[in-house]
């Protein structure tokens, strides 16, 4: 893949959220509010230091692309949802979410127009660019996920709500793009369950006008509480807490790939990134589907080869074996590898070890490809 004019074989990166430095999580003013960001020099300095620490972990592991780590929250729900509620003008009070895996989280409530209340990812992007000279990636929670996780008392339809959220997110994305980040990632972790009829339109609206960065659509089963995601069965009632003990059986008929390919190809994206080796993805997430629905021209495929729902660190050989299997389906010049999802639910030292394994396993396969090319 061509990154900053350099051809990188099987580029490596982590998907997203990462264990924060503990001192940053204890920062009393970390969750500032209002339209001025950050409100003072002390918090600005702390933010930059936290992003630099997370960037340094990635650089030491040898990742090709450095991510922001979603430093704006100290837990998965805060990073993926509640932070956005505050930035988009939600009331943080609301009923339960209607998705089985997230059903014990509360939806934010909308009582008026969606708009940005201060920048969303601009300050993180600035700090990341300052922290590293390597290619950078900034990520956002997807429009479908945010739209579905809303107790709406204002808009007449979910489509109206989605397009309003997309417009607000797009304002921020354009500012981040203008800073010169290399990749902008949109996390659509409810796509494997179903696509709303406006899903692709809203995704494309959110990234409209991006001129510099490559667009990544990250799709996974979700990672709340470390649980494997699942399809609901008839015991699940929308809007209620879903009692796992009453679930009749694990859904096994669908895979992440089978759920989103080829529909996801309609989105304006440069990279499709899927969870591929986790507990719901024992068969590499059903990637055989891509043989019948090949990648569109100029779209790369990045696959998760690190299981973030296990504390066991993969060996380099295990990672290499997963990459070799991927190469049976996706050519090396269009393949990248990542973690399955964010690493925040792990201890930081385990997250560091997993990033090292990701890089070392990729090095093994790169060497094999180089040797085969020389012999040809």
Curated annotation (Swiss-Prot):
Q: How's its activity regulated?
A: Inhibited by methylepoxypropane. Inhibited by the zinc chelator 4-(2-pyridylazo)resorcinol (PAR), in the presence of p- (hydroxymercuri)benzenesulfonic acid (PMPS), and by EDTA. Not inhibited by the coenzyme M analog 2-bromoethanesulfonate (BES).
How does the cofactor attach, per the note?
Answer: Binds 1 zinc ion per subunit. Zinc plays a key role in activating an organic thiol substrate for nucleophilic attack on an alkyl-donating substrate.
**Lineage: superkingdom:** Bacteria
Which Enzyme Commission number(s) are listed?
Answer: 4.4.1.23
| Residues noted as binding Zn(2+) in the record, renumbered to the chain | 218, 220, 341
State the needed cofactors, names only.
Answer: Zn(2+)
> Which top EC class applies here?
lyase
According to the record, mutating residue 220 to A results in:
Retains 0.06% of wild-type specific activity. Decreased binding affinity for CoM
Summarizing the function annotation, the protein's role is: Involved in aliphatic epoxide carboxylation. Catalyzes the addition of coenzyme M (CoM) to either R- or S-epoxypropane to form the thioether conjugate 2-hydroxypropyl-CoM. Catalyzes the reaction of CoM with R-epoxypropane at a rate approximately twice of that with S-epoxypropane. The CoM analogs 2-mercaptopropionate, 2-mercaptoethanol and cysteine substitute poorly for CoM as the thiol substrate.
**Subunit info?**
Homohexamer. Component I of the aliphatic epoxide carboxylation complex together with components II, III and IV.
Q: What is this protein called?
A: 2-hydroxypropyl-CoM lyase
Q: In the UniProt record, what gene is named as encoding this protein?
A: xecA1
């Amino acid at each position: 893949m061509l990154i900053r004019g350099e051809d990188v074989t099987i580029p490596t990166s982590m998907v997203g959220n990462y264990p924060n430095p503990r001192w940053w999580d204890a920062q009393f003013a970390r969750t500032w509010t209002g339209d001025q960001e950050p409100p003072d020099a002390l918090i600005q300095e702390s933010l930059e230091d936290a992003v630099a620490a997370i960037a340094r972990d990635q650089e030491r592991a040898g990742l090709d692309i450095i991510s922001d780590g979603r430093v704006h929250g100290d837990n998965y729900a805060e990073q993926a949802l509640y932070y956005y509620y505050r930035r988009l003008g939600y009331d943080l009070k609301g009923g339960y979410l209607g998705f089985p895996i997230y059903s014990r989280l509360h939806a934010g409530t909308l009582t008026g127009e969606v708009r940005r209340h201060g920048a969303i990812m601009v300050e993180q992007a600035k700090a990341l660019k300052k922290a590293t000279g390597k290619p950078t990636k900034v990520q956002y929670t997807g429009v479908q996920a945010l739209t579905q996780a809303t107790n709406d008392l204002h808009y007449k339809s979910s489509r109206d709500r989605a397009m309003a959220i997309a417009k607000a997110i797009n304002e921020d994305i354009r500012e981040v793009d203008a800073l010169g980040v290399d990749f902008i990632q949109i996390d659509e972790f409810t796509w494997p369950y179903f696509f709303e009829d406006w899903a692709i339109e809203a995704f494309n609206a959110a990234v409209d006008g991006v001129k510099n960065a490559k667009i990544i659509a990250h799709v996974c089963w979700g990672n709340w509480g470390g649980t494997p995601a699942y399809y609901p069965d008839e015991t699940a009632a929308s809007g209620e807490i879903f009692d796992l003990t009453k679930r009749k059986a694990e859904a096994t008929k669908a895979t992440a790939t089978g759920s989103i390919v080829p529909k996801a190809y309609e989105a304006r994206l440069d990279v499709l990134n899927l969870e591929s080796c986790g507990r719901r993805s024992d068969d590499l997430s059903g990637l055989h589907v891509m043989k019948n629905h090949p990648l569109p021209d100029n779209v790369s495929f990045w696959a998760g080869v690190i299981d973030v729902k296990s504390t066991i660190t993969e060996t380099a050989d295990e990672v290499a074996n997963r990459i070799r299997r991927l190469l049976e389906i996706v050519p090396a010049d269009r393949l990248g590898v990542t973690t399955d999802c964010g690493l925040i639910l792990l201890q930081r030292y385990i997250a560091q070890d997993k990033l090292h394994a990701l890089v070392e396993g990729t090095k093994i396969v790169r060497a094999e490809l180089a040797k085969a090319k020389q012999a040809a």
